[in-house]
Amino acid sequence: MHNAPESVLNALVPMVVEQTAKGERSYDIYSRLLKERVIFLVGQVEEHMANLIVAQLLFLESESPDKDIYLYINSPGGSVTAGMAIYDTMQFIKPNVSTVCMGQAASMGAFLLAGGAKGKRHCLPNSRVMIHQPLGGFQGQASDIAIHAKEILGIKNKLNQMLAEHTGQPLDIIERDTDRDNFMSATQAVEYGIVDSLLTSRG
């Protein structure tokens, strides 16, 4: 099955119409939710998506530096460098970033979920979380392959240390558990320390 063209997907984005003193104003649903400080991180983590997320985080900080931002995540993961651009911005800005997993947060998606403000990281009941070591592949001369292998091992160690800090798990446990794809239910993600609570309703 082929992915729908972007123009078709854009046409399917719902519009919200609001009455203002100057008349009616329409927003696409994501822009309207951005006014409520809600950001969606959905799909593959890559450079273009990361730039959009970073821009929204910086914009909301400039609007109200003391109000929380809500980052909803449904992602299979993706690029480490793109993910780290989002992560570093989350840590850099003044507002707390509350993370919510809906659907799945895998690989870099899980890392960003864990990187939310402590006490404000959540999973919806039927969401899934998956952690593992970074993936890499490179072709070329043996010396270049060795350089890239060393870089990937360095990234792996750095991510493991950061995940240990965010979850409270010992580093050796993180190293063991990320050695292969490690899937968790929402409840298990709470127990592991990737998130702080399970959200079943707004109440």
Curated annotation (Swiss-Prot):
Subcellular compartments: Cytoplasm
Record flagged with keyword Transit peptide: no
Keyword Hydrolase assigned: yes
Annotated GO biological process: protein quality control for misfolded or incompletely synthesized proteins
Assigned EC number: 3.4.21.92
Residue positions of the active site: S107 (nucleophile), H132
Top-level taxon of origin: Bacteria
Annotated keywords: Cytoplasm, Hydrolase, Protease, Serine protease
Pfam families to which the protein is assigned, alphabetical: CLP_protease (PF00574)
Signal peptide: none
Molecular function via GO: ATP-dependent peptidase activity; ATPase binding; serine-type endopeptidase activity
Reactions this protein catalyses: Hydrolysis of proteins to small peptides in the presence of ATP and magnesium. alpha-casein is the usual test substrate. In the absence of ATP, only oligopeptides shorter than five residues are hydrolyzed (such as succinyl-Leu-Tyr-|-NHMec, and Leu-Tyr-Leu-|-Tyr-Trp, in which cleavage of the -Tyr-|-Leu- and -Tyr-|-Trp bonds also occurs)
Entry GO CC: cytoplasm; endopeptidase Clp complex
Annotated family: Belongs to the peptidase S14 family.
NCBIfam families, sorted: clpP (TIGR00493), PRK00277.1 (NF001368), PRK12553.1 (NF009205)
Function: Cleaves peptides in various proteins in a process that requires ATP hydrolysis. Has a chymotrypsin-like activity. Plays a major role in the degradation of misfolded proteins.
Quaternary structure and interacting proteins, as annotated: Fourteen ClpP subunits assemble into 2 heptameric rings which stack back to back to give a disk-like structure with a central cavity, resembling the structure of eukaryotic proteasomes.
PANTHER family: ATP-DEPENDENT CLP PROTEASE PROTEOLYTIC SUBUNIT
Protein name: ATP-dependent Clp protease proteolytic subunit
Gene: clpP
